[in-house]
């Protein structure tokens, strides 16, 4: 596994400090909310992405093992859902936020080109829109990583997020407003909702002096501008 090779190579080549980026997917599906770092391994994972979560947990544990056995300074950061420029907008395998941006853009763009008017037909989205999710812009993540490199040296993981969440319905409405899509949404309840809620407790990282600076709507707007210039 590449994580093992990378962590081992960093240690053997004298890297002074290593940051391992995990994911909020490591936490149990029914973890207490907001999720604190000690919720790790306290329950069953979400079955739709448990293989991914287990791989991240393995990397986290390996960092801890190298710290204990060799004194290697490796820290583990657990970011929430990330988005921003250079995201993956492929509808076959993208995450929810960039997928919504693309669907809203293409829905508006296709009909505007055909009839020169607003799009009045809904686009399909998974689930019922009730799950709550937290989103962090990549620029805020970069600042958090830098802060932790300077100020964090503990063996335990540290959450990185905004500490605020929205329902997927609210997210879709915000994206539609930014994009200018007016057709509404068809929520396909035959598709899974996934974890009902996932928001991180970020008290630990905020105690280091870091705070997210980019609001969700502001971040969506800048991401949409990047998408139009580079992907659309």
What kind of region is each of these model predictions?
Residues 1:
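Active-site loops and adjacent core secondary-structure elements that bind or stabilize anionic groups
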Residues 4, 12, 16-17, 25-83, ...:
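Catalytic helix-loop patch of NAD(P)-dependent Rossmann-fold dehydrogenases
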Residues 4-7, 61, 139-142, 146:
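Conserved active-site region of classical short-chain dehydrogenase/reductase
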Residues 92-96, 167:
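Short acidic-hydrophobic sequence patches enriched in Asp/Glu that either
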Residues 100, 106-232:
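C-terminal substrate-binding subdomain of Rossmann-fold SDR/epimerase-dehydratase oxidoreductases
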Residues 8-9, 64-69, 101-105, 150:
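Alpha-helical segments that scaffold the active site and NAD(P)H-binding pocket
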